[in-house]
Amino acid sequence: MGGFKLVSNFKPTGDQPQAIEKLVEGVRRGYRYQTLLGVTGSGKTFTMANIIARLNRPTLVIAHNKTLAAQLYSEFKEFFPENAVEYFVSYYDYYQPEAYVPETDTYIEKDASINEEIDKLRHSATAALFERRDVIIVASVSCIYGLGDPIDYENLMLSLRPGMVKDRDEIIRKLVEIQYERNDINFTRGKFRVRGDVIEVFPASFSNKAIRIELFGDEIDRIAEIDVLTGEVLGYRKHVAIFPASHYATSRDKLERAIKSIREELEERYKELKEMGKIVEAERLWQRTNYDLEMLQEMGYCKGIENYSRHISGRPPGSPPYTLLDYFPEDFLIFIDESHVTIPQLRGMYNGDRSRKEALVEYGFRLPSAYDNRPLTFEEFEQRVNQVIFVSATPGPYEMEHSEQVVEQLIRPTGLVDPEVIVRPVKGQVDDLIAEIRKTVAKGYRVLVTTLTKKMAEDLSDYLKEMGIRVRYLHSDIETIERVEIIRDLRLGKFDVLIGINLLREGLDIPEVALVAILDADKEGFLRSETSLIQTIGRAARNAEGRVIMYADTITNSMRRAIDETNRRRKIQMEYNEKHGIVPKTVVKGVRDVIQATQVAEKEEKYEKTANFYDPDVIKSTIEQLEKEMRQAAIELQFEKAAKLRDMILELRKQLEEVSLR
């Protein structure tokens, strides 16, 4: 397979060419860390695509959540239709990790709902890395979580060609060894079926195609790719590589060694717990682990096999797990998108996992080796990366300290400049704001207002309504889908002013917004830090008449730095426009490609359980609401709450079935 082929109607413009050139040159010189400081709307993704095409290396793009990763994945797929653009995020729709709460003696079993489509995409991503070099994998931070041994994964691959001497039973045995399940009736992903001398395999990385292997005696006669639904032959293959159905698949020899090693650890830990006087814990561990060992012996697999991954891969205690990073070749390139958010996330993954496992190990639910099924620490992540380009409009201290060069991309292809920032006193701020809203709305534009507290946002919203202004309040209790609809309505002009507390997380790139008002701008804190202020100011940068008004009595250090940086960028942009005769134009964007809500997990909502529902729609919406709360509780390690919510959901599902049968 050749290199990357970038397909686009656009050519790099503004300062994109110099950014591409400098970063490509930096990689070639061997710079380990570089930063692309690109303002909102300057085409950072297009710049990344051009760098990938020029360097021709396997590339990992890390985003800070699934939604942002999905957005980048679809953009890169458009830029590289002929190359392998893959998607690697957590495959859980819902995940309640295994936990133990000593205070109430409550053990919560792992409960998860796996998204089959995402699991298929994960397998497709790892398989692509062993088959070709023109690979881009867009991943969330879950790429630093443990995965099986890449050497095993490659060695266990079943490679078949027509004319090869392979007996039918040998192929079947090999498929079972790499975790494929024989099922002649229900033919789904990760299964195979046998009909006489024909074996059909549904690879883990395929979604609607399967492989048909036709044998003649002990020889492979033909290999065809077939449509799973119709059985129609889509084409014949000269070679097929079938990768394991699980990333934790391993050879029988390794499994036998792992079983011996687990048993040794069990005996040692059992003795240790007994000596500490923890009789109940010792017996619990003995029973649970022996059950898992029997499953491994007979089936080659057990529930929670990832907790034994250190034994299976033969790693020493305390050693880092294998992750997606280990599947890449040595010369791979990493882009960390929105690095000011992603880097702190990568730093925090290990500690949260460790604190949950401590109770499980201490109380005899797991062996101490379960600690080694974990995400990488940040230091281990740093050791595994080859060359990194951080991408952000507001790079954090880590990126600025480590980068061997910071390349700025300040010119927008549309000629738009950063908005003018005005500071006004707090006294009379509401009356002044109303006057500014009326002026802006009269021109057909919209307004964003950001406050510090929920109470203030609600009061302001009520007051503006009384003054005859069409306003909506965007708060954390609103679900993602409804939020998308609210922003769509704002763009369509169904209302003119949107009030919120944190307008950063929404991905609110709305061209119709010509005014952003920041109330209490001088109250230092997370929402009024330099980074947050610059990001908020950027919300007005999609409109040629964009302005930002900060209401403050004193100018804080954060405000001063944010205003100075905005004015510096604005000056460079205006000089560029004047030199090249460019007139800024407001972005014209169809309302259907509206926004990208970049926050997957919502804040919790209050839920009071009502006795009985009789309306199926009400039950369904309540289940959806509870599932959202349950996921959030699991993320925040509130396992008892998540377990209670799960039980409520199960109860409501039963009720839904009963109502449907009436």
Curated annotation (Swiss-Prot):
SMART domains in the record = DEXDc (SM00487), HELICc (SM00490)
Motif annotated as Beta-hairpin, chain positions: 91-114
What GO terms in the biological process aspect are recorded for it? nucleotide-excision repair; SOS response
Q: Does the keyword Cytoplasm apply?
A: yes
Task: Cite the entry's keywords alphabetically.
Answer: ATP-binding, Cytoplasm, DNA damage, DNA excision, DNA repair, Excision nuclease, Nucleotide-binding, SOS response
Q: Provide the protein's localization.
A: Cytoplasm
Q: What is its main location?
A: cytoplasm
Q: Name one GO cellular component term.
A: cytoplasm
Q: Which InterPro entries match?
A: Helicase/UvrB_N (IPR006935), Helicase_ATP-bd (IPR014001), Helicase_C-like (IPR001650), P-loop_NTPase (IPR027417), UVR_dom (IPR001943), UVR_dom_sf (IPR036876), UvrB (IPR004807), UvrB_inter (IPR041471)
- Domain UVR: start-end pairs: 620-655
CDD domains per the UniProt record, alphabetical? DEXHc_UvrB (cd17916), SF2_C_UvrB (cd18790)
- Residues covered by the Helicase C-terminal domain: 429-595
Q: Where is the Helicase ATP-binding domain?
A: 25-412
- Which residues does ATP bind? 38-45
GO MF terms listed in the record are:
ATP binding; ATP hydrolysis activity; DNA binding; excinuclease ABC activity
The protein's matches in HAMAP family, at most eight in alphabetical order, are given as:
UvrB (MF_00204)
UniProt family annotation: Belongs to the UvrB family.
Q: Check the record and name the PANTHER family matching this protein.
A: UVRABC SYSTEM PROTEIN B (PTHR24029:SF0)
Its annotated function is as follows: The UvrABC repair system catalyzes the recognition and processing of DNA lesions. A damage recognition complex composed of 2 UvrA and 2 UvrB subunits scans DNA for abnormalities. Upon binding of the UvrA(2)B(2) complex to a putative damaged site, the DNA wraps around one UvrB monomer. DNA wrap is dependent on ATP binding by UvrB and probably causes local melting of the DNA helix, facilitating insertion of UvrB beta-hairpin between the DNA strands. Then UvrB probes one DNA strand for the presence of a lesion.
Q: How does it assemble?
A: Forms a heterotetramer with UvrA during the search for lesions. Interacts with UvrC in an incision complex.
Protein name per Swiss-Prot or TrEMBL: UvrABC system protein B
Instruction: Tell me the classification of the organism that encodes this protein.
Output: Bacteria, Bacillati, Bacillota, Clostridia, Thermoanaerobacterales
Q: Which gene encodes it?
A: uvrB
